[in-house]
């Protein structure tokens, strides 16, 4: 029990000094609740408001694809070099050590794989389970321009509404309709719709022409998908151009774990995202770390 006989009156109240309330400066996030800001601050480094995510959730529709046959062997050694891990709850519980101490963006949608339209997804994780797993955000696809666009929008709305209740951010991942052109106009549309629905983070693709308009027209942070495996120099150039044009980070998978030197690649991407290195300097870092 506290000793009530030794309570001393406080003296240093800083009279005349206004209380300090630093603003939460992540794009579009200043009015969010404390818990949601706290989770976002674990995803996005508060010093740079940027992030390097390692995506290895591909198995939810691709199965044990190249590089993901054994998460414990191929991916676990990369954890310490990423800011954030993006995976499914099955992999998180079975393979990712809690002691890895990395924020997690939890894949929360899934459905078809090889037989029918991939865009026909459903919410695959209850928000209570995401909270139980100490996730920092949940992620679901939104398929603009597909037969199942309406369902995918309902999915993210469900997650957003539940997330607001629990202080859990939602990352909307823009899927591409098979009849849509992968251009600035499409990704601007998809990103803006997801943000208008209330998603706190958008994951979309980099395009060579007009990406700065995609980023500027989206009121919340955008992280780019790595997409298919590219030569390392090209992947780093894509990363640099995206950051230079307004992206708040990257969420790379195949361009990391299918690289011959994945740790070196993560270090090079980190240099671009957090240290503003250009692609040429980052590639030299990759070559140095590779050796």
Swiss-Prot record:
Homodecamer. It holds the Pfam family DeoC. It comes from the Bacteria. Involved in the degradation of phospho-AI-2, thereby terminating induction of the lsr operon and closing the AI-2 signaling cycle. Catalyzes the transfer of an acetyl moiety from 3-hydroxy-5-phosphonooxypentane-2,4-dione to CoA to form glycerone phosphate and acetyl-CoA. InterPro entries: Aldolase_TIM, DeoC/FbaB/LacD_aldolase, DeoC/FbaB_aldolase, FbaB-like, LsrF. Its main location: cytoplasm. It catalyses: dihydroxyacetone phosphate + acetyl-CoA = 3-hydroxy-2,4-dioxopentyl phosphate + CoA. This is 3-hydroxy-5-phosphonooxypentane-2,4-dione thiolase. The lineage of its organism: Bacteria, Pseudomonadati, Pseudomonadota, Gammaproteobacteria, Enterobacterales. It is found in: Cytoplasm.
